[in-house]
Swiss-Prot record:
A GO term from the CC aspect: extracellular space
Name of the protein in question: Protein gurken
Domain of life: Eukaryota
GO molecular function, one term: epidermal growth factor receptor binding
Biased composition (Polar residues): 124-139
UniProt region (Disordered), positions on chain: 78-111, 124-175
Membrane topology of this protein: Single-pass type I membrane protein
Biased composition (Low complexity): 140-152, 159-171
High-level lineage: Eukaryota, Metazoa, Ecdysozoa, Arthropoda, Hexapoda
């Protein structure tokens, strides 16, 4: 029967298990260090955002207080100006004798009947004259708003004005079509940040201008800024959680794959001497047959 070298098998298993243990230990230590570093960086970013938020609140409070002070000063100035105007121009009756003169005029009119007829005739004449002149003034007031421009310039002469087709260019002449083409793979992966979509615009002299279509309230040439209480603050792209994926990759599946690979190598190492063993067994069997035949 075939003698299996158990000592060699144990040596191979020990060496392979040592390699697996060292590999797993080193990978775990590296991943823990990376995770700790990422946590420190994220803590620093969150601290910076909190500090920026506090500064923004302080700036808003200072601005509101300053506006209140300015409004109070303006009201005080208006009140003082009103008091000075009241002191310079006191309330007085400009025509104190007008009330006393009216009864005298009525008495004089009632005393002279001939003057009443003259006054009535003159009033009818003035009323007719005003009635005849009223349509003219109405027509003037109606046409005035149509001719006055916003700049105060006189209206243009209708005879000198030309057709609008010959003087004013059509708005379609000023419109230019902008081509938006998708970017190359290198720009798609690295140019636009925070999930932005990259586009390229062909320019003159065979040059290409790249732009980003931002999402999630990001702004900027490369979508690197985000609105924070009305202001745009630089917000770098968040690091992807590759540590968790690395933990999964370098844990049980990798160990299983390495173990299978090591077992395969051990099987190849152990079974490569099988043909020699079989050849020896066959030779021994033939030798026994010859011995029995001779006997």
């Amino acid at each position: 029967m075939m003698q299996i070298p158990f000592t060699r098998i144990f040596k191979v298993i020990f060496v392979l298990s040592t390699i697996v243990a060292v590999t797993d230990c080193c990978s775990s230590r590296i991943l823990l260090l990376r995770e700790h570093t990422l946590k420190i960086v994220q803590h620093q970013h969150s601290h910076m955002h909190e500090h920026a938020h506090e500064l923004q609140q302080q700036i808003q409070e200072t601005a509101v207080e300053l506006l209140n002070r300015l409004e109070l000063q303006r009201k005080q100035l208006e009140a003082s100006a009103q008091e000075e105007a009241d002191q310079l121009h006191p309330d007085t009756d400009p025509n104190p004798d007008s009330g006393g003169q009216l009864p005298n005029a009525d008495d004089s009119i009632a005393a002279d009947p001939e003057q009443d007829g003259i006054i009535l005739g003159s009033s009818t004449d003035t009323w007719l004259a005003s009635e005849s002149s009223t349509p003219i003034t109405d027509s003037e007031t109606v046409t005035t708003p149509e001719t006055v421009t916003h700049t105060g310039e006189p209206p243009p002469d209708p005879s000198s004005s030309s057709t609008p087709d010959s003087t004013t260019p059509s708005p379609n002449d000023k419109e230019t079509e902008i081509q938006m083409l998708p970017c190359s793979e290198a720009y798609n992966t690295s140019f636009c940040l925070n999930g932005g979509h990259c586009f390229q615009h062909p320019m003159v002299n065979n040059t290409v201008f790249h732009s980003c279509l931002c999402v999630n309230d990001y702004d900027g040439e490369r979508c690197a800024y985000k609105s924070w209480n009305g202001d745009y603050i630089y917000s770098p792209p968040t690091a992807q959680r590759k540590v968790r994926m690395a933990h999964i990759v370098f844990s049980f599946p990798v160990l299983l794959m390495l173990s299978s690979l090591y077992v395969l190598f051990a099987a190849v190492f152990m079974l490569r001497n099988v043909p020699d063993y079989r050849r020896k067994q066959q030779q021994l069997h033939l030798h026994k047959q010859r011995f029995f035949v001779r006997c």
